[in-house]
Amino acid sequence: MATALSEEELDNEDYYSLLNVRREASCEELKAAYRRLCMLYHPDKHRDPELKSQAERLFNLVHQAYEVLSDPQTRAIYDIYGKRGLEMEGWEVVERRRTPAEIREEFERLQREREERRLQQRTNPKGTISVGIDATDLFDRYEEEYEDVSGSGFPQIEINKMHISQSIEAPLTASDTAILSGSLSTQNGNGGGSINFALRRVTSAKGWGELEFGAGDLQGPLFGLKLFRNLTPRCFVTTHCALQFSSRGIRPGLTTVLARNLDKNTVGYLQWRWGVQSAMNTSIVRDTKTSHFTVALQLGIPHSFALISYQHKFQDDDQTRVKGSLKAGFFGTVVEYGAERKISRHSVLGAAVSIGVPQGVSLKIKLNRASQTYFFPIHLTDQLLPSAVFYATAGPLVLYFALHRLVIRPYLRAQKEKELEKQRESTATDILQKKQEAEAAVRLMQESVRRIIEAEESRMGLIIVNAWYGKFVNDKSKKSEKVKVIDVTVPLQCLVKDSKLILTEASKAGLPGFYDPCVGEEKNLKVLYQFRGVLHQVMALDSEALRIPKQSHRIDTDG
């Protein structure tokens, strides 16, 4: 799978990788790495004018890396924000004797100023479209009623309700935000709408408050107040009180929620609601990397119920989740099960089957696209019919796998190739420059590598036979893909010292003599080496630390 290409992937030199030192490297380690590279790239060591020019440029790059990492202040900036952090406006006013913590605070201040200038550009739109479909004629059809009716051979599927809501946010200051929202609903030919305006203020790091004003054609004006407060680091409370004006008078309402973190993954909620539908609700929610579990109990008028639900999260690229729940109360019993899966970078598709008494059988399809939600509840039957349950379960699965194989997967593959091609075109000049720099570095290494090989051969030490870096294609179905690996035998041999080769946890593309042959794609380093006269082989991930020789890399030739 292709990795995301950041803006800094080409522009930001990895100074640690260039010097081949750990991010926690001491001053002595930095100095030793700097001296070794200076001996390799010093312009005075090369007489050929072309090599001398290339050596001078590489020497300056190594010197720049050492200057940044050897200074505690610039190193702190680089560690936190990269090379772009060093170039950010405003650092000229920072005192030279600041600590890393003070530097972080200064950078965050500069970032806040930049964010404030972009406040007006953020609206954070959110929307929901719900379309209720009545498909009961598919399963609850009485044939005798339609025998004498012309054109009644096809079941009637109707849209019986719709709901549309939308909201936007407009940041006024760093602590004040205006929120405008509206909704329209219709059911069986009757409908209405409302519009709301809210003003939210963050009062402190522990809380915020929100004033709400609303009006609609079916209900009168609405005035509300919402408060949030962190009582302790593990406990918070929210309160929402509202006054709804109507022809029948004023209807007050109050909702209070008290929540507490019971442990790292578990939160307990206690809710009290007073007004039109008074109730007391308590629930426990446990959310981990692989599961989500909820148990709830509500006592209220007119609804009282108990709920238990479980969701399993698969650790795959598509973020697949399966879920099931049981809800029982005065209104009846409902069993629901379903699944959801990521179908693109910003889209999640889900489906659930609801089986209840007296509700019947329903199929619910939901698509989340960024901050927009599209919801389609399809009512199949008022009765508990096995055929309805079967088709509600099997139908979406068959349809999804057919669409995924015939439409979604080819589309995503084409989009991925298009993005990669666009990246290659936009970075072609930079890649060519990096390639030329790497080739120049390899030419400058030749004499040093020759001496290293002679020394290693004399003691039966570490000899790099072959080394390749880039994207390896192992799947036979992808053999037609263009080879995207480069030979890095010489650069790796140049890093051998005392029959050892140690590479740190960083992208190998930043090492001297290396470059990225396939920007935006996953890369590996494959090394075939000889130690004590025995062949060894290892394959390492791009950012994986590597230490050779190792006994586990030995190639078994006994068979």
UniProtKB/Swiss-Prot annotation:
Q: Name one Pfam family in it.
A: DNAJC11_beta-barrel
- Which residues, renumbered to this chain, carry the PTM N-acetylalanine? A2
Q: InterPro entries recorded for this chain?
A: DnaJ-like_C11_C, DnaJ_domain, DnaJ_domain_CS, DNAJC11-like_beta-barrel, J_dom_sf, Mito_inner_membrane_organizer
Its GO CC terms are:
MICOS complex; nuclear speck; SAM complex
Quaternary structure, per UniProt, is:
Associates with the mitochondrial contact site and cristae organizing system (MICOS) complex, composed of at least MICOS10/MIC10, CHCHD3/MIC19, CHCHD6/MIC25, APOOL/MIC27, IMMT/MIC60, APOO/MIC23/MIC26 and QIL1/MIC13. This complex was also known under the names MINOS or MitOS complex. The MICOS complex associates with mitochondrial outer membrane proteins SAMM50, MTX1 and MTX2 (together described as components of the mitochondrial outer membrane sorting assembly machinery (SAM) complex) and DNAJC11, mitochondrial inner membrane protein TMEM11 and with HSPA9.
Protein function? Required for mitochondrial inner membrane organization. Seems to function through its association with the MICOS complex and the mitochondrial outer membrane sorting assembly machinery (SAM) complex.
Q: Which named protein is this?
A: DnaJ homolog subfamily C member 11
Q: Which organism is it from?
A: Bos taurus (Bovine)
Q: Which lineage is the organism of this entry classified under, starting from the top rank?
A: Eukaryota, Metazoa, Chordata, Craniata, Vertebrata
